[in-house]
Amino acid sequence: MKILVAVAVFFLVSTQLSAEEIGANDDLNYWSDWSDSDQIKEALPEPFEHILQRIARRPKPQQFFGLMGKRDADSSIEKQVALLKALYGHGQISHKRHKTDSFVGLMGKRALNSVAFERSAMQNYERRRK
C-alpha cells in the first residue's frame, strides 16, 4: 500500500514539475493573446477558418422559406396594396374573418365541429371499404 502511495506522489510531483517547465518557457500571457485578432486569424488553418465563415454567414432573405412558403422577392408594398384593393374593391378592405367548419394546418385538414368530423370519417371509411 505504501508503494502505491509513493508511486502516486512521484507521479503528481513529476507532472507538476513538467507543467512548471512548460509554463516557464511560455512567456506569453494567455488572455492577452486572444485580444489580438491578427494573431488569431494567422493561427487558424485555412479550412477551419472557412468553416467558421460558413457558419457565421447568414442566409439571404430569398433563401429562407418559412412555414408560409416561398416569398416573392420582387413584390413591393405598392403591388400588395393594389392587389388588396382589387380583391376587396376600391380600397374598402373588410376585416371580417371568414370562418369555415374546417381547419387546414400542418397536419392536414381537420374539422372544427365533431359532427362533421365523424361524418367525414365515416364517409372515408365507407369509401375505402368499397
Curated annotation (Swiss-Prot):
PTM Methionine amide: list the residues: 68, 107
- Its family? Belongs to the tachykinin family.
GO CC aspect terms: extracellular space; synapse
Gene transcribed to yield this protein: TAC1
What is the protein's name according to its record? Protachykinin-1
Q: Which Pfam families match?
A: Tachykinin
Give the signal peptide, or none. 1-19
Where in or outside the cell it occurs: the entry states: Secreted
